[in-house]
Amino acid sequence: MGNTVAMILAGGQGTRLGVLTERIAKPAVPFGGKYRLIDFTLSNCVNSGIYRVGVLTQYRPHVLSKHIGIGRPWDLDRKDGGVEILPPYVGRHESDWYKGTANAVYQNLEFLEENDAELVLILSGDHVYAMNYNDLIDYHLLKEADGTIACMEVPIEEASRFGIMITDVDGRIVDFEEKPAKPRSNLASLGIYVFNYEFLKKVLIEDENDPNSSHDFGKDVIPRILRENLGSLYAFRFDGYWRDVGTLRSYWEANLELVLPVPPFNLYDPNWRFFTHTEEMPPAYVAPGSKVSTSLVSEGAEVYGNVFNSVIFQGVKIGRGTVVKNSVIMTRTEIGENCYLENVIIAENVKVGNNVRMGVGEDAESKLDPKVYSGLLTVVGMNSVIPDDMVIGKNCVIGIGVRPEDFKSKTLESGDYVIVREE
């Protein structure tokens, strides 16, 4: 099949995830009890036998770079191949920042040359899915295509969120439009591409020299290939589980799908394991008299209260008399005694005091940003401390690093927020 090199686009900010991505890149956002989003793409690579991987970082890369390290959890700590972090080339003329997804790959053509790339797999580092990339590559080779895009049908009312394509009866793409206001199809790009390297190199150099381009695959490169008939592009239809968790609602829903009696996404398949960088922790502990129902509780967690339909990450502590429902509680968060939390997302290293009620009261629109904070979820940013006896309504936002003295009273009405700005 030729020498395949994977390029994982991992520089996205993920602004629609609000405080969850204020300090970390979207691919570094925790998911599913112990993972980070990029773990799924990295694991798909090694499960597909692809061991030459570049991770293109940009926005707040520290946590992501530390998480990946030399790639040992994914068996990518190799002398031949392996994983390499590829930040923008600081110091190069006008190149201190990747200008778009296509420019990010263009800036790393040298990396592809050094790895003798014949096929280039371009992937997003912030989606949740399991895919054998060999199926995509085999289809690409069968069609003798210059490029192939993985796609799936989506509800037509959601199609405007995606790159949308139209194909002929043979699967060849005849038209592509990025996030159209009035989509003419519901066949959506998954942001997963495979290209013949020499073809990709040619079109990226041409795109880089186009002053009118924003240097993005979906907005510029793919439409231009089709418009100017530069090569053949085919659509590979994927029928497995794939989720874009780019909004708080979709992130929350995808986590809670993991606790369904028959989850649509299987974390437990021994033939397709997902790997991550994690510290060793003891088994989870559920105290006598506590109740855990339809939930995922990760190692190191200590549950002294009651947990229903929730995802509890590693090292979380839940106090006596506390009830947690329909919630996502991230690593090393501690929740005190006699609390009630419903429909909340709490980031890492948060401390919630005793007798706190969160996610309660009347429905209300967010006063901070209704486009980001909706669906009546209350969200707490990392490293915050919620004082005892607080009552926090629905659709509230507690920012990063908030302290007890930042709360003006013991009640935060639905839709309200407490944010501490960085100096």
Curated annotation (Swiss-Prot):
One of its GO terms (molecular function) is glucose-1-phosphate adenylyltransferase activity. Its EC number is 2.7.7.27. Pathway: Glycan biosynthesis; glycogen biosynthesis. Pfam families: Hexapep_GlmU, NTP_transferase. CDD domains: ADP_Glucose_PP, LbH_G1P_AT_C. InterPro entries: ADP-Glc_PPase, ADP_Glu_pyroP_CS, GlgC_bac, GlmU/GlgC-like_hexapep, NTP_transferase_dom, Nucleotide-diphossugar_trans, Trimer_LpxA-like_sf. It comes from the Bacteria. SUPFAM superfamilies: Nucleotide-diphospho-sugar transferases (SSF53448), Trimeric LpxA-like enzymes (SSF51161). Disulfide bonds: none annotated. Alpha-D-glucose 1-phosphate binds at Y98, G163, E178, K179, S189. It is an enzyme of class 2 (transferase). PROSITE patterns: ADP_GLC_PYROPHOSPH_1, ADP_GLC_PYROPHOSPH_2. HAMAP family: GlgC (MF_00624). Homotetramer. Involved in the biosynthesis of ADP-glucose, a building block required for the elongation reactions to produce glycogen. Catalyzes the reaction between ATP and alpha-D-glucose 1-phosphate (G1P) to produce pyrophosphate and ADP-Glc. Belongs to the bacterial/plant glucose-1-phosphate adenylyltransferase family. This is Glucose-1-phosphate adenylyltransferase. The lineage of its organism: Bacteria, Thermotogati, Thermotogota, Thermotogae, Thermotogales. The gene is glgC.
